[in-house]
A protein has these predicted regions:
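Intrinsically disordered, low-complexity proline/glycine-rich segments
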Residues: 2-110
Length: 110
């Protein structure tokens, strides 16, 4: 079973410029490892994306542009926190990437 993600867990982005990004939200009242449990729809920190990853012509500069308002878009089908599916290592995020870091002592299936 995969480890449960938390606020501050790393995600890979699946694109250039910022190759990793952190989960920027979590439960205020369900805590693991002193951090809030991450859930589906929790936000990711703002980051940049390569223009070429968006199918935009390159050059001109800048190579990287802002890529805000991204979120966790997958979670457990059977384990919920605050009525939302918990996020786990391997679950997908809006940026074509996955959660890559979680609390190894807390696992959840489904």
């Amino acid at each position: 079973m995969p480890s449960v993600a938390y606020e501050g867990s790393d995600c890979n982005t699946g694109h250039g410029c910022d190759t990793t990004v952190k989960i920027n939200g979590g439960s205020a009242n369900v805590i693991i490892g002193s951090k809030g449990v991450a859930r589906k729809d929790d936000p990711l920190e703002d980051h940049t994306i390569a223009k070429t990853d968006l199918g935009l012509p390159f050059p001109p500069p800048p190579l990287c542009i802002d890529h805000p308002n991204q979120k966790v878009n997958e979670g457990s089908a059977s384990v919920f926190v605050n009525d939302r599916p918990i996020a786990r290592v391997g679950d997908s995020v809006d940026i074509s990437g996955q959660i890559t870091e979680g609390e190894s002592s807390v696992v959840a299936g489904g």
